[in-house]
Amino acid sequence: MARKRGISSLLLIYKQSFVIWGALLIFSPLLMFVGDSHGLQAKCLYCVAVMGSYWVFEALPLAITAFIPMILFPLFGIMRSEEVARAYLPDTCFLFMGGLMVALAVEKCELHARVALFVLKTVGSEPARVMAGFMGVTGFLSMWISNTATTALMVPILQSVITELVSNHRMEDLVALCEAHHNSSRKHSVGMRRLSLPNENNEIKREEMDTAMSPREQKMAKGLMLSVCFSANIGGAATITGTASNLVLVGQLNELFPGADTGVNFLSWLIFAFPMVFCCLIYCWCVLYLLYLRDAPKGSIIVTRKLQQKYNELHAFSFAEMAVIFCFALLLVLWILREPQVVPGWGEMFKDEFVSDATSAMFIVILLFTLPEKLPSSRGSSEQRKASSGLLDWATVQDRFPWSVLFLLGGGFALAAGVKESGLSHDIGAIMRYLDVFNHNIIMLICIIISVTLTNVCSNTVIASIFIPIVAELARSLEIDPLNFMLPVTISASFAFLLPVATPPNAIVFSSGYLKVFDMFVSGLCVTLGCVVLSMLNMLLWAGFVFNLHLFPQWAANPSPPLDVQDWAVENNITFVGTSKL
């Protein structure tokens, strides 16, 4: 027994090394298909398997694993080094950078805290209403800033609210004991004592909050905590910039079908996804209410006053906050009106396909660095007249921008490019074509279930990067619009509710100490099942009208390859003179 424990501890200590070298050896038989007609596909499958193993078991940092294609693709003859490098930073990455930098500007001026407290002090202190308020605020914020940042903001506020709810509940119990102890002839003194209890509230909290919460209070705290991470995951799916997996879809569409007018843009995605996200949030609230809040302590005016007090303590609207609101609103207008579909957009003023949503995002980023944080003044001392920094500064970006996620996105795009270039996606699609014995809707449901299952054990960005090209090829082989499978796979990649390790929001909430893995798994399973059904209904009843999915589009039947510089020169009869190969 001791020997077994020693081996187990040794495996845990050297787990990282075992996974790194074990994956290389276990999948090495794939490299034996050297002279085979599918040799290139086998080599690419080896790269996918190794990267997938490293990502799932986190043998290396996720961003470092993303650089593997830069090494293996050129060595295996799948893609040239410069082609792989170009795949790491497509247009979608600049869209991601722009969206996150705007979010950093919002966080820097603390505008997000003002919005959160305003909504919470409005909904009141009833636990069910508090949950609805937190879910609404979290879902809305996660549409525009990262799910992780949203959760990190909301959890401390929620912990404060839970403390107020619990202390208020205990104070009311103490009032009830006082009323039971005194006889009816002393009603007035009891009433005076009740009025004085709020002044003793701090003393009660010091004595009582040191002890463990009652089961009823623990149950309430669990439900409120879960509502934050679940609504952050759901809300991010509502906009095309809300979560990384949505951006992966945009990048994969550009990679797999270059130059195609797929109809996927900021406005069309919002129209497609927002109704489903709204329904998912309502369903999630119902599930968590039934599981955790049916017998929760009632709220009172004290907690409402506490939220009102915190909101009143905020300073007046600063110039920075108003300027960030302006930039944020301008960005939304530029995104929505570039290709509104119903009327000509401002993008038509320029050459076709020359302007994208990334153009708008980077314009706003430069504007954030240009506009001052404080309104210039000609009065006051020389120190007061000193020029202020911009709404966003590079030190903040360097310190808080998630560069690793950018590299992870790029690695996904490079991996997808290799899968396409080697023909592996075509082969996998041909194998999956045997699913054509099923109805297309059944295949769609199978894709959703696979995506939901995998996204709970590794990054949703990874799942989207690997799985989207496969289902796209499957749809092409069945001669149906690839968006029929790509859209539900992308949406369902956000439904990571089962485990703390599934997403950073889950991990942040779990680290609060209120939850056990079993709590998250049971409630997450109920939420997942409902969200899968709602996602399926959204595809069947709504998505077809938004994206016209009923016909097999020409851009999917004959995807044009990306135009190389040399190809462009030949087409335009241009000869480069006096140039040398770099």
UniProtKB/Swiss-Prot annotation:
Its main location: membrane. GO terms for biological process: citrate transport; succinate transport; transmembrane transport. It is found in: Membrane. Pfam families: Na_sulph_symp. GO terms for cellular component: plasma membrane. Low affinity sodium-dicarboxylate cotransporter that accepts a range of tricarboxylic acid-cycle intermediates with 4-5 carbon atoms. There is no interaction with monocarboxylates. This is Sodium-dependent low-affinity dicarboxylate transporter 1.
